[in-house]
Amino acid sequence: MLSRGKRLGYAAYERLLQWELSGTPDHVAVIMDGNRRYAEKQGTKKQEGHKEGAQTTEALLNWCDELGIREVTLYTFSTENFDRDPEEREHIFDLVEQKLRTFADADRVHEAGVCIRAIGETEMLPERVRDAIDYAEGRTAQYDQLNLNIALAYGGRAELLGAARDVAAAVENETLDPTDVSAETIEERLYEGPTRDVDLIVRTGGDERTSNFLPWHANGNEAATFFCTPYWPEFRKVDFLRAIRTYQNREDSWRTTRAERSLALVRAIEQSELPTAKRMLGRFRDALPSTEREQLDEEYDLAD
């Protein structure tokens, strides 16, 4: 239990972080790690760690709704998790089934326009979990304000391997010309789920690795990553805001780099190409350091 002073400090820091944010990612993927280690630290059963982790998941969805994030993907159960103790595994399945049905019926889910979808090799899951998936997807299929993708029986390598096999089979059957294979060809054969590339990956629990989560949507987009030490049940809104700040800092750095490269390009091109280059540079003008921005305005008259 935190002291009153610490609670006030966290609240103030949380407000400061939120005030400093100038933008949020469209798609956040979360690796919710540390439920079992949290339970061990607390001296309780693993099941209690998973229950408390589920409460953090509900809080996360509220934060995403508040901040206007459009898509969230939760790494809930990997294909490797099938190797866990049967009792723990069944408890996780019970919890997933319960939460899927609860979310699907929750007023706040319908008010916020949340569309729930499962991604992964769901045919490997128990029938009761598959039924709960069908129920949740059916109840929320009409919404598009916030896409909630729940990764169940998911493995990044398996997803890419399945897509590659489908492409190979199509080529062998002569329904696909090898010269027509493109990024879109692969993407069409991935698990049906994410509608956007991942902007930010968050992992709790102290491990600094992405566990091959959403490799096509995250690695291909060079998503920002945020690793933090709190176990998933300990994850707070202030931690989430710090993660978003990491994304924001990366975006700001990217824009500055693009702006500086555009400026170098403008200075190097021929006069006949200058109008096109100036339009491109104008898009990134505000990302330049103030001294370079002033010099740019003077040289090329880009200021409003």
Curated annotation (Swiss-Prot):
Q: Which residues bind Mg(2+)?
A: D33
Q: What is the recorded function of this protein according to its Swiss-Prot or TrEMBL entry?
A: Catalyzes the sequential condensation of isopentenyl diphosphate (IPP) with geranylgeranyl diphosphate (GGPP) to yield (2Z,6Z,10Z,14Z,18Z,22Z,26Z,30E,34E,38E)-undecaprenyl diphosphate (tritrans,heptacis-UPP). It is probably the precursor of glycosyl carrier lipids.
Q: What class does this enzyme belong to in the EC scheme? A: transferase
Keywords per UniProt: Magnesium, Metal-binding, Transferase
Give the GO biological process terms: polyprenol biosynthetic process
Query: What family is this protein classified in?
Result: Belongs to the UPP synthase family.
Keyword Magnesium tagged: yes
The UniProt entry annotates the active site at D33, N81
Q: Which GO terms describe its molecular function?
A: ditrans,polycis-polyprenyl diphosphate synthase [(2E,6E)-farnesyl diphosphate specific] activity; magnesium ion binding
Q: What is the protein name for this chain?
A: Tritrans,polycis-undecaprenyl-diphosphate synthase (geranylgeranyl-diphosphate specific)
Q: Which reaction does it catalyse?
A: geranylgeranyl diphosphate + 7 isopentenyl diphosphate = tri-trans,hepta-cis-undecaprenyl diphosphate + 7 diphosphate
Describe its assembly: Homodimer.
Look up the EC number in the record and give it.
2.5.1.89
Name the domain of life.
Answer: Archaea
The cofactor binding remark recorded in the entry reads:
Binds 2 magnesium ions per subunit.
This chain's source organism reads Haloarcula marismortui (strain ATCC 43049 / DSM 3752 / JCM 8966 / VKM B-1809) (Halobacterium marismortui)
Needed cofactors: Mg(2+)
What gene name is given for the protein in this entry?
uppS
Short name of one Pfam family: Prenyltransf
Q: Does the keyword Glycoprotein apply?
A: no
Positions that bind substrate: 34-37, 46, 50, 78-80, 82, 84, 203, 209-211
